[in-house]
């Protein structure tokens, strides 16, 4: 019987490298695919594409798999980056990794892999897939959290559909990150000690405000407290996100006390796009930073349909602990009420629902309801 062919995305990082080795050990025919998805500034000091390709090719040689490079820069710019900029211009804070996974890593990449005769694709994400074997959902594929809760990436994968998940393997889903590092060291992979990437999907770890400034027009405006007092000037609403503390530029006013009695560090609490006004508050637990409910749109449900109205858990940001909530979901919209108020619920970010370890899907936060 011919081996199943798996095309794996190899980024030059440790996770995808160890994933390639694991797949080969499991008896698959493995082909590596390195994706180049950004080329606006290949010569920038922040662009690591060349080194990443060298690392990926070196690992492929050690592991014993073929590897090729493919350029998805045009697809990334059209499907991900353009939407990323539109969201920032609208005053929201998007998560490009969510859209990149759905549109590039599991769509453009999947399509290319099929042209290479792949039976399955694989990535180095920390998540799991499981086929339902009985009951009314028999044959459905579920997206589950990774065993290593500290590295779980199901939040970023919640927009994947049945067609995508049914063709996907996550070799690291049952493995802890510490074990991945050990395997890389034992294999003497050339990137065994390489740091994990923490930058924007495919764009890297460059200064974010400087990067946005190249693509967005901006207009300075007033920075106000809830009582309407002007305490400074913002450089442009696109450069701020709810809950932000650093980079506001009011470090010398920490002891200032507002009429509401709050004092302490300043946080971004609200963006009034219509009036180009940034509202800031003092104190981590200021009421303007706490939300009891949210609304979301652009829903994507893993099972292809909205979950029934029952108690679930939600995440409104990566690595947040699951939060108990009640919800009413349709194919297109979500209304969610938290059991306990949540901090800095941010329009543009994703609200993702879970039933235990099972990721149900989610959508883009459009608004939140303050506790006061």
Swiss-Prot record:
One of its GO terms (biological process) is tRNA wobble position uridine thiolation. Disulfide bonds join 100-201. GO terms for molecular function: ATP binding; tRNA binding; tRNA-uridine 2-sulfurtransferase activity. It catalyses: S-sulfanyl-L-cysteinyl-[protein] + uridine(34) in tRNA + AH2 + ATP = 2-thiouridine(34) in tRNA + L-cysteinyl-[protein] + A + AMP + diphosphate + H(+). Keywords: ATP-binding, Cytoplasm, Disulfide bond, Nucleotide-binding, RNA-binding, Transferase, tRNA processing, tRNA-binding. ATP binds at residues 9-16, 35, 124. InterPro entries: MnmA-like, MnmA-like_C, MnmA-like_central, MnmA-like_central_sf, Rossmann-like_a/b/a_fold. Its EC number is 2.8.1.13. It comes from the Bacteria. Residues 151-153, 317-318 are annotated as: Interaction with tRNA. It is found in: Cytoplasm. The active site is at 100 (nucleophile), 201 (cysteine persulfide intermediate). It is an enzyme of class 2 (transferase). The record marks 125, 349 as: Interaction with tRNA. PANTHER family: MITOCHONDRIAL TRNA-SPECIFIC 2-THIOURIDYLASE 1, TRNA 5-METHYLAMINOMETHYL-2-THIOURIDYLATE -METHYLTRANSFERASE. Catalyzes the 2-thiolation of uridine at the wobble position (U34) of tRNA, leading to the formation of s(2)U34. Belongs to the MnmA/TRMU family. This is tRNA-specific 2-thiouridylase MnmA. It comes from Herminiimonas arsenicoxydans. The lineage of its organism: Bacteria, Pseudomonadati, Pseudomonadota, Betaproteobacteria, Burkholderiales. The gene is mnmA.
């Amino acid at each position: 019987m011919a081996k199943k062919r798996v095309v794996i995305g190899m980024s030059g990082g440790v996770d995808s490298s160890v994933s390639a080795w694991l797949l080969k050990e499991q008896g698959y025919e493995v082909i590596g695919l390195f994706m180049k998805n950004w080329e606006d500034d290949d010569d920038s000091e922040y662009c690591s594409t060349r080194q990443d390709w060298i690392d990926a090719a070196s690992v492929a040689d050690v592991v014993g798999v073929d590897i090729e490079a493919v350029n998805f820069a045009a697809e990334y710019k059209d499907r991900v980056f353009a939407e990323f900029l539109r969201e920032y211009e609208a005053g929201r804070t998007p998560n490009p990794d969510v859209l990149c996974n759905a549109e590039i890593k599991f769509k453009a990449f999947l399509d290319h892999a099929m042209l290479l005769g792949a039976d399955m694709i694989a990535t180095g994400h920390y998540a799991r897939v499981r086929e339902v074997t009985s009951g009314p959902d028999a044959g459905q594929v579920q997206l589950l959290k990774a065993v290593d809760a500290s590295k779980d990436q199901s939040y970023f994968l919640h927009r994947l559909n049945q067609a995508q998940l049914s063709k996907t393997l996550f070799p690291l889903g049952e493995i802890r990150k510490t074990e991945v590092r050990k395997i890389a060291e034992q294999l003497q992979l050339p990137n065994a000690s390489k740091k994990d990437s923490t930058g924007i999907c495919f764009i890297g770890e460059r200064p974010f405000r400087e990067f946005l400034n190249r693509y967005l027009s901006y207009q300075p405006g007033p920075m106000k407290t809830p009582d309407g007092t002007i305490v400074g000037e913002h450089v442009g609403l696109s450069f701020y996100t709810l809950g932000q503390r650093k980079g506001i530029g009011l470090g010398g006013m920490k002891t200032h006390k507002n009429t509401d009695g709050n004092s302490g560090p300043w946080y971004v609490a609200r963006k009034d796009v219509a009036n180009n006004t940034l509202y800031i508050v003092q104190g981590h637990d200021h009421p303007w930073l706490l939300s009891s409910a949210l609304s979301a749109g652009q829903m994507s449900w893993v099972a292809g349909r909205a979950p029934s109205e029952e108690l679930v858990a939600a995440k409104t940001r990566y690595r947040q602990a699951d939060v108990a909530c009640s919800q009413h979901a349709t194919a297109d919209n979500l209304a969610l009420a938290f059991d306990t108020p949540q901090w800095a619920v941010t329009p543009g970010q994703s609200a993702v629902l879970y039933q235990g370890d099972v990721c149900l899907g989610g959508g883009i936060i459009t608004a939140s309801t303050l506790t006061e």
